[in-house]
A protein has these predicted regions:
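Charged, low-complexity surface patches
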Residues: 8, 36, 87, 164, ...
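Short amphipathic alpha-helical segments enriched in leucine
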Residues: 17-20, 37, 172, 176
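Basic/polar phosphate-binding segments, predominantly the helix-turn-helix DNA-binding elements
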Residues: 1-3, 26-59, 83-105
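Intrinsic disorder/low-complexity signature
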Residues: 15-17, 39, 186
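A short, Lys/Arg-enriched amphipathic alpha-helix from helix-turn-helix/homeodomain DNA-binding modules
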Residues: 2-27, 60-77
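Short, flexible segments with low predicted structural confidence
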Residues: 3-5, 14-15, 30, 53-55, ...
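A solvent-exposed interaction/effector surface
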Residues: 46, 57, 65, 69-73, ...
Length: 293
């Protein structure tokens, strides 16, 4: 890649970062073109040529994604407040747009989200982000740590990854009822299958929260387990952490062979340290742990 193209991409990346940080602000063409230091007369076409979406469409999808996360996973805001934060002047307009995109009203989505239309609706946003957000890693990004064992409460997800959102929603509701807040009790995902198994029903991941308290299931299927201590190769990922396959493959393809280390008999897992939508999506943080012998 030429220096000129790297500079061009960096200017476009500044725009995406600004949008993520300022979803509550007026993100008109003049504002966002100024962030990249491009002419407003050309920027709309430059943005579309780079990302495959117009600026307006990109902002609309980013706001709607945050709104849908708040509806499904957070209950501190009313539907009206979520609508206003998404840039709508009236709840009815938000409800119409939401139903058109996801086939559900906001209230219905909050109670029982249908995740397949949701995943399809945000495909263009994820594709746009991936144009410039392909992260590259080096050996210096990987640290070897001695990790202590961690007692965890586990909610298992077994089955199609398209329904994972429903399990996450139940997990969040359960940990809240159990008083296990993310600020005081660490959050882990343990992957027990590949990301895209040949049959979707074979997908398997454990949603975990660290705790030394007695576990109250509160009507959910919760079991107690342990993430074993030991040496781990650790890779920190900052940004969109919905899909951690690229950094995971870096650990296996480059980090593991070049180090001479061997993987231990426990699955790859991650700890989630900063969560969207509490932070802008590009500021979310997760750490991948590859257990070593």
């Amino acid at each position: 890649m030429s220096a000129a193209l790297r500079n061009y991409h960096a200017r476009m990346q500044r725009v995406l970062d600004h949008i993520d940080r300022h979803l509550d602000d007026d993100l008109d063409l003049e504002t966002v073109s100024g962030i990249a230091a491009f002419s407003k007369f050309h920027f709309h076409r430059q943005f579309t040529a780079t990302f495959g979406l117009s600026v307006h469409r990109y902002v609309q999808l980013a706001r709607m994604k945050r709104a849908s996360y708040r509806l499904a996973y957070r209950d501190t805001q009313s539907v009206t407040e979520v609508a206003m934060d998404a840039g709508y002047d009236a709840p009815d307009a938000f409800a119409r747009a939401f139903r058109q995109r996801f086939g559900q009203s906001p209230s219905s989505f909050r109670k029982a989200p249908d995740w397949e239309p949701w995943l399809a609706a945000f495909g263009p946003l994820e594709e746009a982000r991936n144009k410039l957000m392909q992260r590259t890693f080096t050996a210096d990004d990987v640290a070897i740590r001695n990790v202590p064992s961690m007692r965890v409460a586990i909610m298992e997800h077994r089955g199609d990854p398209a329904t994972l959102g429903a399990t996450v929603q139940r997990f969040i509701a359960w940990r809240k009822s159990a008083g296990l807040h993310p600020r005081t009790n660490p959050t882990f995902n343990v992957w027990r299958s590949e990301r895209r198994p040949a049959s979707p029903v074979d997908y398997s991941v454990d949603l975990c929260v660290g705790t030394d308290k007695p576990i109250e299931a509160n009507g959910e299927q919760i079991r107690v387990g342990e993430i074993p201590g030991g040496r781990c190769a650790v890779l920190r990922v900052i940004g969109n952490t919905d899909n951690l396959e690229v950094p995971a493959l870096y650990l296996y393809h480059t980090g593991l062979p070049s180090s001479g280390e061997e993987a231990r008999d426990f699955p790859l897992y991650c700890q989630r340290l900063a969560f969207f939508p509490e932070v802008p999506e590009h500021e979310a943080i997760a750490e991948l742990f590859l257990p070593l012998k």
